[in-house]
Amino acid sequence: FQNSLLSWYDGYQRDLPWRCDPSLYKTVISEFMLQQTRVSTVLPYFDRWINKFPDFQTLATASEEEVVKAWEGLGYYSRARNLHKLAKIASDWKAPPETVKEWKELPGVGPYIAAAVTSIALKKPEAVCDGNLVRVLTRIFAIDQEYKDGATAQKKLQPLAQSLIDTDRPGDYNQAMMELGATVCHRQSPLCLTCPVMNFCESGRAGHAENFPKIQKKKNKKFFIHIFKFCFFSNLIKKINY
């Protein structure tokens, strides 16, 4: 599975700026920007950001106003502020932290970013698990379990994701899984016939990949009008007016 996935990734990965001449700083910036934001939206912002703030030290010495201004348009401004705080910490590093646990203690860094940074930039065998990975994994293994929500699915599937990590190329493996989810294993109309791991995919071979993952649909909240209260106060107001 890993060999098929990585061979495909080596030949078909998208040409993204944070993959060219990669560094710890570029990985951190890209992962912060890509939280809840599409790659196509991030691309121009990433290039401008790197030109303006080429390293942790430059970012750390910038004012918060400059940082937020450079982020303007990407939304979720807490990401920019946390990134600024992280840069101030990083500018004093003699060596970066090497474990997921240590990274999760930094501003704005959750399980996903911690695993992405440690695997991509530091070559540690730590698997990422987000919505893309949930979709890919539940389809490959045809996992019938219904999850309460996406966050629950990610937490439950993290051990499975970890068991599949390629220890020789953990960063490339994580990026390949993300690439697969973004470009082939779509939420709707997945491109199963061109999938590099189709031979390993139970739901794909059975022809019902779109049935996975199984996430409970959110129930619409029902709002009730308290007719009695409305009528009572309406009549009371009328009496007062008379």
Regions found by a protein language model. Give the residues of each.
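Catalytic cores of DNA base-excision repair glycosylases
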Residues: 3-4, 8-191, 197-206
